[in-house]
Amino acid sequence: MSTRFLRVCVLTVALAAVAVGCGSSKSSSTSSAAAASSTSATSTSSGGTSTPGISVTSFTNDFSAMNALKPLAASGKGKVAAILPDTTSSTRYVEFDAPYLKKAAAAAGLPSSDMTVENALGSDSTFVTDAESAITNGATVLLIDPEDSGTGVTVQRYAKAHGVAVVDYDRLTLGAPAGTADYVSFNNVHVGQLIGSGFVQCVNQWHVSKPNVVVMHGAVTDNNATLFAQGYNGVLASYFQSGKYTLVARTAGTWMPPDALTEFEGAYTAHHNINSAVIPNDETGAPIISYLQSHGVKPKTFPTTGQDATLTGLQNVLSGYQCGTVYKPIYLEAQAAVALAMYLRAGKTAPDSLLNAKTVDPTTHVSVPSSLLVPEWVTPANMNDTVIKDNFVPASQLCSGKYAADCKAAGITS
């Protein structure tokens, strides 16, 4: 996403508790943004030392803003270790997060030997072991994205006992002791709101007169899934209450694509009138769309949604099987996380323009200092100006084979 799409979150967001999956996993969160300073500003640490100022609006796809952090990299001590969750729930961790985190660290002046990125491959025990090993090997800052909060709490407690700073990367760890971590992510309730409003717009544009909807969810152990659901359920509530839409089924929730397909097949088999689906990400939506295609569903007749702007998701959007996808420019998130790590590693206080929000942990009611970025809803109408312009997905890949005509219709040239 180009910088004109990035805005600082300036509203207080009050989130109602919602049922996630078949149970009643309730969660609420609030955030508020502080005013942003310019890149050239300076901030003063708790020790009175002048440090480079940086804002969530500073970051661009050329990583140039990270240059301002070189003095912090030079004065800081120890290594920065990032631990990512898996390779299956989303392609982002391998394709984008890992290389972007390394690129951001290099641009900030951190030697490659002082920046490590590990992937736990879906194993909670591996995640904890990776964190402990990183600390043993000299990490003074951890960037962690565990699949569940229990694992995150274990890591945060171990890190605190060893004097290591922690940044929750992309997911907030619920139930963590106060003051053990900061948080970097996109505004995840807004992600859900984009999914919900995109679905509504699509229902209208595709002329689905009587939407019979299955609402799907991410894993119930993932706080992000809860926040996404709060967003789209909030948008859709009035449509269900008024009878304009019919809520036919809700699924239990998963980030595993085969399991998501199984959940959808169960609902679709039990309710043949289902003609639309709210799906929280592209990876879980892909097998569902393939299933619908194999059952003769035509383009622009069965609205579905997604998130992460994967290659397959974008192609499904272009071909009329998915309404749109939430684009979260991961290069922005990676830079924000590494920037925060540079302050922590140097023992400095990050400016309010970087930690621009507070996120309330619904289990402890602790306010967690947060850096929140703003996502974008992508359709064929703005695909060229977002994911293609950013080279998030190369046009040559997007427009290959049978998608060439769809790209041409959307004004995308490879």
Task: Kindly give the residue locations of the regions a language model identified.
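Bacterial N-terminal signal peptides that target proteins for export
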Residues: 1-9
